[in-house]
């Protein structure tokens, strides 16, 4: 629900009124920086399901394996079926990240930018590629209390760009999340890479920073070591019980 809260924290304006319009700008461009982790993929899934859908969603990453998994769980073809043009890009392979990200939008820029990694360079790129009336959300919470980055104040004045941060959500965000999951319009499973039983809970919690992948799902009613979902098929070839699970 905090992902939905992030989208709902963004706002835009219209020249003929002083009202603020809540949420992502319908029919425009969304950029999710560092978006191939579990929360970023949740943000992609929601972008394809929300009422005010964007025209284009661009997701950045610097790791090819994470990009490959992202394409597997939420493909460009699936997004197209939902009426959204989805792009996954490896910014580590770009000569000029800002120029190439803007090129995807034909120079227009991004109306809603989400920073899913608390890294100065990423935040500064987001600021540089905002469209007119763009809004950038620092979704990833930094641990450094003096974390800072440069912002183009000229654009804040003349292009009406905005920067905000969001953490968590409210009751209506939670209710919307539950409704979308119930209707199978979003797929929270894209965020999960490992599952385990209650006996794996303590060790997983203690070593969480050392375990790669996305979210870890613990089933309280079973006994099972923490296992990567992608390993199930291989395990099934070696063990009949695992084969039945697969």
Give the label of every model feature segment.
Residues 1-14, 36-38:
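A glycine-rich, Thr/Ser-enriched phosphate-binding loop motif common to dinucleotide/cofactor-binding enzymes
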Residues 13-29, 108:
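Short helix-loop-beta connector
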Residues 33, 44-123:
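Adenosine-nucleotide cofactor-binding segment
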Residues 38-39, 66:
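Hydrophobic/small residue at the entry helix of a nucleotide-binding pocket
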Residues 55, 134-135:
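Glycine-centered, small-residue-biased loops immediately flanking beta-strands
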Residues 95-96, 100, 124-128, 171-245:
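C-terminal hydrophobic helical "lid"/dimerization subdomain
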Residues 130-132:
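Helix-to-beta-strand junctions that scaffold the AdoMet/dcAdoMet cofactor pocket
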Residues 140-160:
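Rossmann-fold NAD(P)-binding glycine/threonine-rich loop
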């Amino acid at each position: 629900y905090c992902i939905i809260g992030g989208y709902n924290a963004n706002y835009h304006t219209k020249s003929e009124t002083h009202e603020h319009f809540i949420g992502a700008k319908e029919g425009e461009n969304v950029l999710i920086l560092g978006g191939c982790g579990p929360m970023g993929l949740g943000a992609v899934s929601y972008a394809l399901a929300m009422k005010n859908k964007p025209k284009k969603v661009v997701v950045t990453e610097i790791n090819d394996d994470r990009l490959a998994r992202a394409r597997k769980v939420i493909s460009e073809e699936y997004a197209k079926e939902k009426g959204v043009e989805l792009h996954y890009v490896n910014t580590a392979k770009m000569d000029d990240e800002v120029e190439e990200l803007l090129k995807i939008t034909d120079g227009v820029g991004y109306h809603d930018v989400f920073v899913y990694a608390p890294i100065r360079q990423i935040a500064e790129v987001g600021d540089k590629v905002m469209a007119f009336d763009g809004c950038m959300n620092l979704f990833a919470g930094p641990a450094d209390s003096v974390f800072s980055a440069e912002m183009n104040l000229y654009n804040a004045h003349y292009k009406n760009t905005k920067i905000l941060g969001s953490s968590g959500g409210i009751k209506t965000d939670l209710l919307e999340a539950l409704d979308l999951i119930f209707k199978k319009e979003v797929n929270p499973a894209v965020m999960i890479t490992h599952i385990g039983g209650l006996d794996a809970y303590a060790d997983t919690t203690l070593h969480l920073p050392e375990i790669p992948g996305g979210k870890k799902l613990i089933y309280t009613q079973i006994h099972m070591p923490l296992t990567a979902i992608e390993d199930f098929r291989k395990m099934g070839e070696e063990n009949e019980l695992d084969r039945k699970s697969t």
